[in-house]
UniProtKB/Swiss-Prot annotation:
This is Large ribosomal subunit protein bL12. The lineage of its organism: Bacteria, Bacillati, Bacillota, Bacilli, Lactobacillales. GO terms for molecular function: mRNA binding; structural constituent of ribosome. It comes from Lactobacillus gasseri (strain ATCC 33323 / DSM 20243 / BCRC 14619 / CIP 102991 / JCM 1131 / KCTC 3163 / NCIMB 11718 / NCTC 13722 / AM63). Pfam families: Ribosomal_L12, Ribosomal_L12_N. Keywords: Ribonucleoprotein, Ribosomal protein. Homodimer. Part of the ribosomal stalk of the 50S ribosomal subunit. Forms a multimeric L10(L12)X complex, where L10 forms an elongated spine to which 2 to 4 L12 dimers bind in a sequential fashion. Binds GTP-bound translation factors. CDD domains: Ribosomal_L7_L12. Forms part of the ribosomal stalk which helps the ribosome interact with GTP-bound translation factors. Is thus essential for accurate translation. One of its GO terms (biological process) is translation. Belongs to the bacterial ribosomal protein bL12 family.
Length: 120
């Protein structure tokens, strides 16, 4: 038995909303599937979870660029050139995937030398 896809689509176009709803339910029951979008289900599951990893973004260097570079170098362990490039490229993430306490500690150190920082 060959399926004529175009004929099936034309038949579906002529069906009422109630008939289409019944068809979807029958297909779900027959094949053991769900018509729910998997993206929506994943989004709903993730919305209830508490965030445990944070990113620290240097949004503005402020007036004390040299001090900010030194702090970034201490925090990241990068070399002088890489730390300077990171600071010059602001807004940029200084650290990613850190705990809330560590993120707030980094933020405090950078703000102490005049930088503007966002924890995401």
């Amino acid at each position: 038995m060959a399926l004529d896809t175009e004929k099936i689509i034309e038949d579906l176009k002529g069906a009422s909303i109630l008939e289409l709803n019944d068809l979807v339910k029958a297909i779900e029951d027959e094949f053991g599937v769900s018509a729910a979008a998997p993206v929506a289900a994943a989004g709903a599951a993730g919305a209830g979870a508490e965030k445990t990893e944070f990113d620290v973004e240097l949004t503005d260097v402020g007036q004390e660029k040299v001090k900010v570079i030194k702090v970034v170098r201490d925090i990241t362990g990068l070399g002088l050139k890489d730390s300077k490039d990171l600071v010059d490229g602001a807004p940029k993430n200084v650290k990613e995937g850190v705990s809330e306490d560590e993120a707030n500690d980094i933020k405090a150190k950078l703000e102490e030398v005049g930088a503007t920082v966002t924890v995401k």
